[in-house]
């Protein structure tokens, strides 16, 4: 018995029904849960897979190890694609992704308004959809336009009626599992925050762009994520 995330991911991959997997040259995985580790092992039978070994504690020793894994992955990509990834390229990517995360965080924080400006499903679709854009550089501007439009309409009185405000936490939500949000909102509630891997959990704590060691900065940002595989997992409690 495996969780729906593992079953659906592997099912879409092996059945060749996922266009993203179909056109991908390489899959990068990570050692989070046992189910995903076994999934990547089986995926490697029909697609190149590189697995990053993720520490299970947010200690300084874990940070050193995670930094080495990031560098190892960078070197693997260079060898696999026959390219050179410079530090300047890394810093440019860090800056862009910081801007993207900040714009999406600002979007999610609109749900602090009471009554809520829009449904939580709409926000989640926007956050999820941002991951599948071909031109990432335009994402912050597009998200800002959406924020401005929502706020303009809110000031005009266009918003939801007062509803019970719901926090959703737990496993990632996307695709068919959006029905969880839909069920809540079709029955009179409004999902104002989604605290999971596909929600606000990844949007805080930007990578420190001015850090002399950019790889350590990247490692520190991602290792601090309040993921359920971490023990202890105080960062998740703090986020909630």
Language model features with spans:
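Trp/Phe/Arg-rich N-terminal binding region typifying the photolyase-homology
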Residues: 1-87, 193, 197-198, 202-240
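A charged, amphipathic alpha-helical module
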Residues: 75-206
């Amino acid at each position: 018995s495996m969780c729906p995330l593992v079953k659906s991911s592997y099912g879409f991959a092996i059945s060749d029904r996922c266009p993203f997997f179909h056109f991908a040259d390489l899959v990068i995985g990570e050692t989070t849960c046992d189910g995903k580790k076994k999934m990547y092992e089986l995926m490697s039978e029909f697609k190149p897979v590189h697995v990053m070994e993720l520490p299970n504690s947010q200690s300084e020793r874990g940070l050193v190890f995670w930094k080495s894994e990031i560098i190892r992955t960078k070197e693997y990509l260079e060898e696999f694609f026959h390219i050179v990834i410079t530090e300047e390229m890394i810093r440019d990517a860090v800056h862009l992704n910081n801007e993207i995360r900040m714009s999406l965080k600002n979007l999610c924080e609109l749900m602090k308004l009471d009554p809520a400006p829009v449904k939580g499903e709409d926000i989640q679709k926007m956050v999820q959809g941002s991951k599948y854009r071909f031109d990432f550089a335009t994402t912050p501007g597009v998200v800002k336009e959406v924020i401005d439009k929502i706020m303009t309409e809110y000031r005009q009185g266009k918003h939801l009626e007062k509803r019970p405000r719901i926090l959703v936490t737990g496993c990632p939500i996307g695709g068919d599992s959006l029905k969880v949000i839909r069920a809540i909102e079709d029955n009179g509630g409004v999902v104002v925050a989604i605290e999971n891997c596909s929600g606000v959990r990844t949007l805080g704590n930007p990578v420190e762009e001015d850090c002399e060691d950019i790889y350590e900065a990247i490692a520190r940002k991602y290792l601090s994520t309040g993921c359920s595989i971490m023990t202890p997992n105080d960062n998740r409690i703090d986020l909630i």
